A protein has these predicted regions:
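Active-site-adjacent "subsite" loops/lids of carbohydrate-active enzymes
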Residues: 31-33, 43, 113, 118-183
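Aromatic- and glycine-enriched glycan-recognition loops and surfaces
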Residues: 43-58, 85-107, 237-244
Length: 385
């Protein structure tokens, strides 16, 4: 190579690298303005699923976040994880995700499959034998363990977590997302609980030998207690690695599918408490949009936290999560929606479906408030349709 050709060729290589980097991190169009979460407790039958999608479409929502994984069990026909306990771990005779996709497509709204990422089981008792076997029974080493090698204990009404520091756990969660986008015409995958869980923070999980070996190899630090900053950073990086592996798996299966995440209400709490560095995920192009869970009754605090989220998002798409279920006065919900949009959020998402309509597991109580919310809140959706 002569000096005269060396510079142009190097310049060409530099241009290619810049284009590749920009292509990985550029913000994609996220066509979401009015979204709503439908939880796994909002439906029990095929009729329930049809009614859910029918209601949200008629109300003017353009996007539904439809929960299909709760805690190592699922609400679709999977070859990887067993049916959910809500269906007695057996095929209920219909596929909720298939029905939801069909109904959403016919009504012109986008459906994102919502999964709880790290929860591995929920409740005070172990799961029964299932096919495929549930992780708690089949893969005890996948769960968080303390320094005495005791697995995170089961507890009433909350989750025990899979260990996101283990490569095999990250691979499994990514495979679930890949299975969904390969089998179903979803518009995207919506991640929840993509973090260390609040319960167990004081135990400083994980302390199992495999996790500590990985920490030592990757940081050249042998003792987390002697290097607390490196320990925190490494665990945060493992959550980011999980998001990256999910992104790669989804892209391999369906390049058009969006990847979004329900994230902690402020970046600082997310970063420091549950090791969820979601502003970094946005900047790296690992996710397409965030839904900060800004569930609050207080308007001033809501506004302050929305501003914090937007500042750290740096122009990337933010859909503000509104805790509609907390508001006995629909005026609070409307005010929060108005504030979020005025401050610069691309849109909002309501938590949750059962705030507006009687849902599968809910009783009839609260019918008057649900009706009032439908009358007062939902009409503002329609101009955007």
């Amino acid at each position: 190579m002569t000096p005269s050709t060396q510079i142009p060729n190097r310049f060409k290589l530099l241009c290619v690298l810049v284009l590749l980097i920009c292509g990985c991190t550029a913000s994609r169009d996220v066509p979401i303005r009015n979204a709503i979460w439908i939880t796994r407790w909002d439906y029990l039958s095929e009729v329930d699923v049809v009614k859910c999608i029918e209601n949200v479409a008629a109300a003017g929502f353009d996007t539904v976040l439809f929960q299909v994984r709760g805690n190592g069990t699922v609400f679709y026909r999977s070859e990887i994880e067993p049916w959910a306990e809500e269906f007695q771990h057996a095929d209920p005779g219909f596929d909720p995700l298939e029905v939801a996709c069909r109904e959403a497509t016919s009504r012109g709204i986008a459906l994102h499959a919502w999964i709880n990422a790290v929860p591995g089981w929920r409740g005070a008792t172990a799961p029964p034998d299932t096919v495929p076997p549930q992780h708690w029974n089949a893969r005890p080493g996948w769960f968080l363990h303390d320094a005495q090698l005791k697995r995170q204990p089961l507890q009433p009404n909350y989750y025990v977590a899979l260990n996101p520091c283990l490569p095999q756990v990250r691979e499994h969660i990514a495979a679930i997302c890949s299975e969904i986008v390969e089998k179903y015409p979803v518009a995207g995958i919506h991640l929840d609980y993509i973090r260390f869980l609040e319960s167990g923070i004081e135990t400083d999980y994980p302390r199992d030998p495999e996790s500590l070996k990985l920490f030592s190899e990757q940081t050249h630090q042998s003792d987390p207690d002697a290097a607390p900053e490196a320990w925190e950073r490494w665990r945060r990086d493992q959550i980011t690695a999980l998001v990256r592996e999910i992104r790669q798996a989804v892209r391999r299966s369906d390049r058009d599918a969006l990847l979004t995440a329900a994230v902690y209400r402020t970046p600082l709490i997310a970063h420091d408490r549950v090791r969820q560095d979601w502003p970094r995920w946005l900047r790296l192009g690992l996710i397409d949009a965030v839904f900060p869970m800004q569930y609050d009754r207080e308007i001033p605090r809501f506004e302050k936290r929305v501003r914090e989220c937007l500042r750290e998002a740096r122009g990337y798409p933010v859909l503000m999560g509104i805790g509609t279920y907390l508001h006995d006065d629909p005026a609070v919900t409307l005010r929060q929606r108005q504030l979020a949009l005025r401050l610069g959020c691309q849109g909002v998402s309501h938590f949750a479906y059962s705030s507006f309509w009687q849902a599968g597991h809910a009783g009839a109580s609260g019918a008057d408030l649900r009706l009032l919310r439908r009358q007062r809140i939902l009409p503002v959706n329609r101009p955007h349709r």
